[in-house]
Each structure stands twice: as C-alpha cells, then as structure tokens.
Curated annotation (Swiss-Prot):
Residues 12-215 are annotated as: FAD-containing monooxygenase (FMO) domain. The lineage of its organism: Eukaryota, Fungi, Dikarya, Ascomycota, Pezizomycotina. It comes from Aspergillus fumigatus (strain ATCC MYA-4609 / CBS 101355 / FGSC A1100 / Af293) (Neosartorya fumigata). Its EC number is 1.-.-.-, 2.1.1.-. GO terms for biological process: fumagillin biosynthetic process; methylation. This is Dual-functional monooxygenase/methyltransferase psoF. The keyword Zinc does not apply. In the N-terminal section; belongs to the FAD-binding monooxygenase family. In the C-terminal section; belongs to the class I-like SAM-binding methyltransferase superfamily. FAD binds at residues 18, 45-48, 57, 63, 110. Keywords: FAD, Flavoprotein, Methyltransferase, Monooxygenase, NADP, Oxidoreductase, S-adenosyl-L-methionine, Transferase. NADP(+) binds at residues 55-57, 185-191, 208-209, 328-329, 495. PsoF is a unique bifunctional enzyme catalyzing two different types of reactions at completely separate steps of the pseurotin biosynthetic pathway and comprised an unusual combination of two domains, one homologous to a methyltransferase (MT) and another to an FAD-containing monooxygenase (FMO). Pfam families: FMO-like, Methyltransf_12.
Length: 905
C-alpha cells in the first residue's frame, strides 16, 4: 500500500496559552505545524470569556509565558490581576512577535482526530469537512473551554436579552437602568455580579451553592513594581514551581494545631485577608486544606468575615457555605460581599427552590416571580475532560478516548495516554490544580525534547506503556483520595471531580500534588531514555510519512528552524516588532529622499557625473512611483515628529539622521558618503543593527549546527570587512573561544580591515587566518588551493561584483564537492538600503552587467545563477521578516562535483 505524506509535522488544537506555547516549541524544532481554533482570535478561553469584570486570579508575574526572557522585557501588565483584554493583547503580541499567527486557522472547530496504525499519522477533520494530517497531534484545548449547558425550562420563551458568560458576544451591551438576573455564583458569576451591581437598576442573584470568596486585593502596578517584577522574575517562578498550586506564595511553615492560641490564629488570618487571594489560601496555615480541624477553623474565619461585612443577617447566612473550605475552588474578587449591602441587589437562594424561565423573567418553584430585562448565565464549564471529549478522538485500533475515559480517566503525567500514539496532551486532564502557566512551561519543554528525540533518531511513533499510565493514574487518585476534601467535593458538585455536570461520572480531573511532584516523573523518562515508552522506527518505506528532514551539507536544517531563532533586537527595547520597526525605518528614510529630490529639482541641481547618476535616478523613480507616493502619504510627519521617530530607531536612526540631511551634498559631490557613514564605526554597526542582523544570525546558526557535528571543517569568509557576520558566527560557534573548526579563513579585498578585525576578534585569534582575496579574480592565482573549503560565507558582498556568474564560479572553485555556500543577501531595495549603500560606489559595480536600478537579485534569480555556475541552486532560503516587509535572507547552496570551470560559460 502507498503510504500518504502528511500535510504537517504537527497539528495543535487550541490557540490559548497552551497552543501558543506549543506552536513556538514546534517552530523551534524546525517542524511544520498548523493550529486550529474555534475562536476568531488568539486567547482560547480568554477570547470567549469577554464578560464584564473578567480577569485572572493568578498574579501577573506568574500568569505569563516564560520560554524566552524578552517576553518579560517587552511587556508590562498594568494590574496585579490582569483583566481579560490585557491577557488577550499579551497573547496577540506573542503571536506577532514570533510570527506564529500565520500557522493558525481561526473560526475552525475540530470534530474528530483519528490515528492510523498503518501510517502512524493523525487525521484531523473540521466541522466544515476539511481534512488535515500530521504525525504529531497536540490537543491544547484547555480545561475551561466547554460551557455547561443551561438546564432551565422555558429559556427560549424569555422576551429579554440572554447571555452566557462563556460565549460572551463581541459587541457592546448596555446594562444601565436594566433589571438583570445572574444565575451562578462561581468565579465567573462573582466577577459579573461585582461589576454590574453599580450600574444595573436591579440585580437579582440566583445562588444554588455559596462559595468562600476571598478578597483579591487587586492594585495597579506602578513603574517600581514592574521593575521589581522583572528583577525577581526567576526567583518568583522558582517559588511558584515549588508551590503545590503553582502560585508565588511560600509555604508558611505554620500549623493551626500548633499556633499560639486564638489571637495568633486571628492575626495570621487577618494578615492573609489583607494581602488577598492566594496569600490567604496558601500563605497563612499549611494545614488548612489537609487537616479537618484546621480547615474548620479557616472556614469559620471566612464565615465570620461574611457576617461582619453583609449587614442583612439572613442574606449573610445564605452566603455562608457549610461545606469545608476547598471542597470547591475558592474564587477571589474585591467587593463581592459588600455588593449585597446595595439596595438594588437581591440574593435568591435556589438550593431547594428550583427555578424556571418564563417570558418575563425567572420564577421559583415556591411561586416567587422576578421580572427581568436581561438574564446572564454564569454556569461554569465541563472542565478537565470536556474539551477533549467533545472531539471524536480515536487512537490505535480505533479506540475511542471518550469511551476510555468514561471507564477511568487515565493519563501518564497528564501528557500521554496509552493506545494514542504521538498524541501529546498539553495542559489537559491530570494537570496540576492551580496556576496553569507555571505547569505549561514544564509540559511544553518535555514534549519538545521528546519530539526532538524522535526526529533525531528516526522514530515514527511513541506510546506510553499501560503499566506506566496505570501507575501515574493510581498516584493521582491516591493523592486525591487521601484528602478529607474528596468526599465533600463529590457532594458539592465540584468541577474538581466533574459532578457539576449532570450524569458525568465522578473522576478526579486534576493532580493535587503540584508540579513539584509531577515533574520528576517526566525528568525520569528523559534520564532513562524514555524507559516507560515504546517507539516504532522509520524504515525506508515509513520515511515517506513526511518527516521534515531537510538536510544541507549533512545537517538537518529548515527555514522554520532558522527563522524561529530568537535574536535580541533594538526593536525589543522600544516595544516594536521587527516588521513594525522596519516599516518606520523606511518611512523616515523616504521623507529625507523626498526632500532631497524636491531640493535638487527646485534648485536645478545635477548629480556628479559618476555612479551618483544612477543613485539619483533610483531616488527620483522611487519618489515618483505609486509605492513611493503611498509611503509618503502614510508618513505625514512634522520635523519634530520625524526627529522623535528617528530617535527610537537605534542604529538605523543614526544612519538616517546622519545621511538623510546630506543626500544633496553627496549627490552633487560636495561631500562623500564615506565621510559620514565611517565615522564612529557606523558602517560596522549597521551590520549589527536590526535591519542587518537576522540573516547574519541565520548564517551563524547554520555554522553552529554544522560545526557541532564536525570539528574538522574548513571555513572561508569572503569580504569579511568589518567582521559583523564573523562576530555572529564566532560568538555562536565558540562563545568562550574554544576550538570549533579546523580553519576560519578571514578574507577581504583590502588588508586594511585586518588589524581592526584582529583586535575585535582577539578571543578567537588562534582559530583565524587572514588573507587578501578578490573573489572576482581566479583564487588559484592569489594563493588559494581549489576545492579546499567545506563552508564559504559571503554576507552582502557578492552582489557588489561586476559579473555575478564569474564571481560564483570562483566561489565554486574554492569549495569541496558537497561543500556549502552560505549567501547572505538583500533581496529587495528599500529606501533605507538605497540611502545607506546606494551612496557608495561599490554598490554600482554591476552596472555594466545591466544592473542599473539595483545590484540586488531575488532568491529566484540567485537560484538560476547558482545552477549556471556548478551549484545545486537554492537548497534553503530563510527570510528576515514575514510577508511584505522582508528584504534580506540567507541562501544555502551545495557545490556539485560536475562543476562549471569556465567563468560561467
């Protein structure tokens, strides 16, 4: 049977925290991935839950992604507990920062995921009937993404507005002067109630089960607090990882049983209450959730708080839970109990008085009627297994996950399920109860290492043993079963065990031992070579399954691997994406070019009769073009505004500020461009700037991959000049000056660069050799032996030669057969590069070859030229930026043995 090739290496379901983190991990590995999400934008549950007052009760400093340090540096939350819109903005920023949005299909609901034993491939089918296939399946569907269905008779008959918090509409809703009924007093209901009470004409709260609501004690984050967060971030996360609930709260070491009397207990509780939320829950007494007596003392303190806050005694008693603190997840909110002191707020106890909806509102079984304009359903979620059970997931031998989990909820460490090969669950059932982002980092990292192991070793599938899954599941059940809260959670309809959903079997959905006790299970697998896992190997036939194994020079490398390399950029410091900065750089440059053209024309000036004639024509053509006019019309700036923009643009801003005002003088020969761009090493720094750095870093990353496999390779760099690319390569391949290759030959047309380079690169002096090379002439006549080098690097130099085919043929002579040519080149003329390099004579070396507009070539043109001169063509192209802003790339090509030996003819 012919095996199919999958569409992607991996498919991710869900674009919330877990999905975004998973996409980045897959991109890091160089794998192709597709993410499907039913929402219209990123966020997962944070996209759907847009109800008034929605915010996290996890503190900002631990409710974030942590896979790279710039995520912290580039973003500041504004409050201790970020609101929904900030969480969504944050995730959207991450998508755009790492160009992940292109891999996501929004408004796409997944209906089924079926595994093929024959092909080791998952087939994903969407609600619209679209089918996509992949080797790896990563459900990152979340634990609170499936709303609980409203069970109320007569809901369709209601003539007013009905909204469910978990599917809140995007449009604005008016609440003022309306009679509003809210059904539900879990975390969501409490936030809605607190937010709407001040604006509603009347707010009727229908409560079945009261909750222990702890004040959040939210506050805005000032600049000092934000600085402190960044300084102590790693230490704070270490605390959160050790905390059983994943929050940055140290265990107090105190026990109620050994406290120094009622006054001391009261003092500790009051202090925790004043600090709020998890400082009260987790930072007062360590036995509050462990010991029945300690729990009773804690519960009674909260009940006394309720009675002291709520003025109406009957209302206060209805708000007081009678079950133990922690049997249901305690919500956190500011001002909740105070809300019931308002004259427009009424609490209705429906614990033993069922409700139904009629055309005018809600009525109880006892006969009370409440006329309403709006009903808000805050009913909670089918947590834990709900989202995955909604998808028809079938593993090996067509085994239904939904049916398997109905019998017993089983996983291995919350990540793998026996019988479902290559399915990596990301923060689903058996996730440690508590703060998800802290657990997510450990899960995503382990999944990435496991997939990387499979890719490196040619493994087709992974499946955890039934014994390992049973051992973990039994551990989860024993940890929960050993708590006195287990029985109460079942009785109180807690979503911890799923009994909030009618008919759903009582199963512990989460792990109550914390990530500190889960992660060792994962680490053990890494340390023992995945001893609890079985793998199948890719043979020759199975290789057609579509494993992404692109190799250049014997190294596994893909554009995705290189383009996902994280590079600290100046744009990061001012909160811009690289694409945003590039757009501003070119817009600011265009303003100066426009002013120069206007001055030249109005004064009747002519350029000096040399290469500047070509430069002048290109500038005029740009200003007169539709594209130029569009850029200029979109860049309407006063001189002061232009200066402010340029000041934010780092090295590129220096170039614009220095060269822009001198364009007319350079054109007319009154001054020379080199006098400006060489001052203060500006030209050298241009190659290290955001505009020039990404493709250079790709070159360095490929060199690192190559030299990590072979230390005997010989490297030659053409036109190394100021050493910008060299520095990137050496810092990555040999950060401490250690040996990494047999030879690194540093060449340039002029020896004048060598002394400065020897000083700059002194750490690597024992590895470097320096020799003059004019690549336009035969290398053999300059003392170079043919077919000597394994890797030749040329960064933004080949285009500045007179005859490209002649130059490339000379490069080919220096490479061994099978050697790799790494060509970093600009691929599109931008206003900035026209200003920076168009002002230099070397830019126009190719005029006689017909390159009069620009010396630059597109990747397609380079592909053709390389094939003409003894190379394989472009084996790989990795670009600097997405879409229309891209203008630079790394091209890798292999030297063929049947070489062209005559200067391209």
């Amino acid at each position: 049977m012919t095996r199919i090739r999958p569409d992607y290496d991996a498919i991710v379901i869900g674009a919330g925290f877990s999905g975004v983190r998973s996409l980045w991990e897959l991109r890091r590995l160089g794998l192709t991935a597709r993410c499907f999400d039913a929402g219209s934008d990123v966020g997962g549950t944070w996209w759907w839950n847009r109800y008034p007052g929605c915010r996290t009760d996890g503190e900002a400093w631990v409710y974030a992604l942590k896979f790279l340090p710039e995520l912290l540096e580039e973003w500041d939350f504004t409050e201790r507990y970020p609101p929904q819109e900030e969480i969504q903005w944050y995730l959207s920023r991450v998508l755009d920062r790492y160009d992940l949005r292109k891999d996501i299909e929004f408004n796409t609901e997944v209906k089924s995921a079926h595994y093929s034993d024959h092909d080791s491939i998952w087939k994903i089918t969407t609600a619209s009937g679209k089918v996509a296939t992949a080797r790896y399946f990563l459900p990152a569907t979340g634990i609170t993404s499936i709303p609980k269905e409203p069970p109320f008779p007569g809901l369709q008959s209601f003539k007013g507005e009905v909204y469910q918090t978990s599917t809140w509409p995007a449009h604005e809703i008016e609440f003022e002067n309306k009679r509003i009924g809210v059904i539900g007093t879990g975390s969501t209901g409490i936030q809605v109630i607190t937010k709407l009470a001040p604006v509603a004409e009347q707010l009727i709260v229908f409560q079945r089960t009261p909750n222990y609501v702890i004040p959040a004690q939210n506050y805005p984050l000032d600049e000092k607090k934000r600085e402190d967060i960044k300084k102590t971030f790693d230490a704070t996360w270490d605390i959160a990882k050790r905390n059983l609930a994943g929050h940055a709260v140290k265990h107090s070491g105190r026990m109620v049983a050994s406290a120094g009397g009622p006054e001391e207990i009261q003092r500790v509780f009051e202090d925790g209450w004043a600090r709020g939320c998890y400082d009260f829950q987790l930072g007062t007494f360590d036995d509050s959730f462990m010991d029945p007596h300690a729990n009773a003392v804690t519960s009674d303190f909260i009940r006394q708080k309720i009675r002291s806050i709520v003025r109406d005694g009957d209302t206060a008693e209805v708000l007081c839970p009678t079950y133990p603190f922690g049997a249901r997840r305690p919500p956190c909110a500011d001002g909740y109990y105070e809300t019931f002191n308002r004259s427009n707020v009424k609490l209705v106890d429906i614990r033993e008085d069922e409700i139904e909806v009629y055309d005018q509102g809600i009525k109880t079984a006892s006969g009370a009627e409440y006329e309403l304009d709006m009903i808000i359903l805050a009913l909670g979620f089918d947590t834990g297994t709900g989202a995955m059970n909604k998808i028809d997931i079938r593993g090996s031998q067509n085994r239904s996950l939904r049916e398997s989990w109905t019998r017993r909820l089983e996983t291995f460490a919350g990540v793998l399920v026996h019988g479902y090969p290559n399915m990596f669950v990301v923060c689903g059932p058996h996730l440690p109860a508590g703060n998800q982002p802290v657990s997510l980092e450990a899960f995503a990292s382990w999944i990435g290492k496991t997939i990387e192991h499979m890719e490196t070793n040619g493994l087709a599938s992974i499946d955890v043993s039934n014994e390992a899954m049973d051992a973990w599941t039994t551990h989860v059940e024993q940890v929960w079963g050993g708590s006195f809260l287990a029985k109460h959670a079942h009785e109180q309809g807690s979503w911890f065990v799923g009994t909030n959903i009618p008919g759903k079997p009582s199963r512990i959905m989460f792990y109550f031992g914390g990530m500190v006790n889960l992660e060792p299970w994962l680490i053990k697998e890494l340390e023992t070579g995945w001893s609890s896992m079985s793998f199948t190997r890719l043979d020759g036939a199975e290789a057609s399954n579509g494993v992404s194994k692109q190799t250049v020079g014997g190294v596994h490398v893909t554009p995705e691997m290189l383009e996902s390399v994280q590079i600290p950029l100046e744009a990061d410091k001012v909160g811009m994406t690289p694409a945003e900065k590039s757009k501003l750089v070119n817009a600011a440059t265009a303003v100066y070019i426009d002013m120069a053209v206007e001055e030249m024309r109005s004064r009747g000036l002519a350029p000096k009769a040399d290469y500047r004639v070509h430069w002048w024509k290109v500038m005029q053509d740009f200003v007169d073009s539709g594209e130029g006019q569009r850029v200029l019309q979109e860049t309407s700036l006063t001189n002061q505004e232009l200066e402010r923009v340029i000041a934010k643009l780092g090295i590129e801003g220096e170039v614009i500020a220095r060269m822009g005002p001198e364009i007319v003088n350079i054109l007319t020969g009154k001054t020379h461009a080199l006098a400006h761009i060489m001052r203060d090493d500006l030209l050298f720094r241009v190659y290290l700037s955001d505009e020039g750095r990404r493709a250079n870093r790709y070159m360095a990353e490929y060199a690192r991959l190559l030299t990590s496999q072979r230390r005997d390779i010989r490297i030659l760099e053409i036109g190394a000049g100021t050493g910008g690319t060299t520095s990137e390569v050496l810092n990555l391949c040999s950060p401490n000056g250690e040996s990494f290759c047999a030879e690194y030959m540093y060449t340039d047309l002029s020896p004048g660069f060598f002394n400065a380079a020897k000083t700059t690169l002194k750490k690597w002096e024992s590895h470097l050799a320096f020799q003059v090379l004019n690549i336009e002439d035969d290398p053999a006549g300059q003392g170079f032996k043919e077919h000597t080098y394994d890797l030749i690097i040329a960064a933004n130099v080949i285009h500045a030669t007179a005859r490209l085919t002649n130059t490339l043929s000379n490069v080919h002579k220096l490479l061994k057969p099978g050697g790799v040519f790494g060509l970093v080149e600009l691929t599109r003329l931008t206003p900035f590069y026209n200003l920076t390099f168009g002002s230099l004579s070397g830019w126009w070396a190719g005029v006689d070859e017909g390159r009069t507009e620009s010396p630059l070539q597109s990747p397609q043109q380079w592909n053709s030229l390389l094939k003409q001169t003894g190379f394989s063509g472009v084996d790989l192209a990795a670009y600097d930026l997405p879409g229309p802003e891209r203008h630079s790339c790394l091209l890798l090509s292999t030297a063929l043995s049947n070489s062209v030996t005559t200067n391209g003819h």
